[in-house]
Amino acid sequence: MSHPPTILRKTHPLLSLGNSMLVDLPSPANISAWWNFGSLLSLCLILQIITGLILAMHYTANTELAFSSVMHICRDVNNGWLMRNLHANGASMFFICIYAHIGRGIYYGSYLYKETWNVGVILFALTAATAFVGYVLPWGQMSFWGATVITNLISAVPYVGDDIVMWLWGGFSVSNATLTRFFTFHFILPFILAAMTMIHIMFLHQTGSSNPLGINSNLDKIQFHPYFSFKDIFGFVILLGVLFMISLLPPNALCEPDNFIYANPLSTPPHIKPEWYFLFAYAILRSIPNKLGGVMALAAAIMILLVIPFTHTSKQRGIQFRPLAQVTFWILIADLALLTWLGGEPAEHPFILMTQIASTVYFMIFILIFPILGRLENKLILLSKNTGKFNWNLTY
């Protein structure tokens, strides 16, 4: 009696891990393009690590040479200009995908997979830290003053704040030691991100993906390859196309003009601001006139994502069938867009007042409005069931 042939990808100790994650993974049959952003983030991370390693071969972490070494990469290194443009604009694409991924998680209730969601929020915080220390490396005006302003905020932490700032700076101000430290952090953090991504995927595969209907999909699953692998590749093509188009046509469109000026500690830029993808958090920071309060608000702007699973009161998983919550969700998106714009404006009237209102709305939506709407919609559904007009199935 002949035995069926053994399939190496299913029996090999290492290949079987990849097989269970990328080939034979049971996936809900109805997941849409909004579920592509996880794989797009993996692509962005791989691209950033590759281009970053190439740039690190030519970069010099020294205050006297850092700015010149970046110019040397762009002018003298073969395709160095392309690597630098891909790395700089790749960060923007990275954060676009992150925000879309988080938005999808909020819209479709993916945060109810608490372990996966919490690891994802930690990944977001680590990515933000990586991007911040990377922004300092070219040693332009905005690099220097951004590092000075943001790191100085840590001094607001009671008792230990000043000591932490001194350790970060390696002295009494942002200096050569600071640049060396930041280059070290920027080099090692992406590899920590890659390890955390594996943990994120492991937790996800314990529960399986959610789906656009928000119901249990165990009865209708298909294998990941070839159905969703080709769908992901289509997303890769679009992302790479947009990234190369930006990097080749307007490569500096998303960069800060002041950062093309060599860092000068004696000349403060008229308006210090971070990259565009941090402007919403920077606006929330500036909305509080107190230093410690601003730091707490900045941390809360990201850490509030950890609270969402515990303030979920609706009997439905997502908001795709909840009109009131949908309106609130899109108000949140508009509010974030407004905060992003306000973060790039000077800290003066009327922008300060607008920022304070927008920041209050941001926190109110997560802490108060979403939970209240969840309970209200539960009551409306119960009322409609009692009147016999609709037959609702609320299990997920």
From Swiss-Prot:
This protein's UniProt keywords: Electron transport, Heme, Iron, Membrane, Metal-binding, Mitochondrion, Mitochondrion inner membrane, Respiratory chain, Transmembrane, Transmembrane helix, Transport, Ubiquinone
Main localization, broad class: mitochondrion
Biological processes, Gene Ontology terms: mitochondrial electron transport, ubiquinol to cytochrome c
Binding site for a ubiquinone: 205
GO CC term (a single one): respiratory chain complex III
SUPFAM superfamilies assigned to the protein according to its UniProt record, in alphabetical order: a domain/subunit of cytochrome bc1 complex (Ubiquinol-cytochrome c reductase), Transmembrane di-heme cytochromes
Presence of the UniProt keyword Secreted in the record: no
Bilayer topology annotation: Multi-pass membrane protein
Residues the entry annotates as binding heme b b566: 101, 200
Cofactor: heme b
Cofactor-binding details, from the entry: Binds 2 heme b groups non-covalently.
Spans traversing the lipid bilayer: 37-57, 81-102, 117-137, 182-202, 230-250, 292-312, 324-344, 351-371
Compartmental location: Mitochondrion inner membrane
Entry-linked InterPro entries: Cyt_b/b6_C (IPR005798), Cyt_b/b6_C_sf (IPR036150), Cyt_b/b6_N (IPR005797), Cytb/b6-like_sf (IPR027387), Cytochrome_b (IPR030689), Cytochrome_b_C_euk/bac (IPR048260), Cytochrome_b_N_euk/bac (IPR048259), Di-haem_cyt_TM (IPR016174)
GO molecular function, one term: ubiquinol-cytochrome-c reductase activity
Protein residues bound to heme b b562: 87, 186
Similarity remark: Belongs to the cytochrome b family.
Function: Component of the ubiquinol-cytochrome c reductase complex (complex III or cytochrome b-c1 complex) that is part of the mitochondrial respiratory chain. The b-c1 complex mediates electron transfer from ubiquinol to cytochrome c. Contributes to the generation of a proton gradient across the mitochondrial membrane that is then used for ATP synthesis.
Record's miscellaneous remark: Heme 1 (or BL or b562) is low-potential and absorbs at about 562 nm, and heme 2 (or BH or b566) is high-potential and absorbs at about 566 nm.
UniProt subunit comment: The cytochrome bc1 complex contains 3 respiratory subunits (MT-CYB, CYC1 and UQCRFS1), 2 core proteins (UQCRC1 and UQCRC2) and probably 6 low-molecular weight proteins.
Protein name: Cytochrome b
This protein's encoding gene: mt-cyb
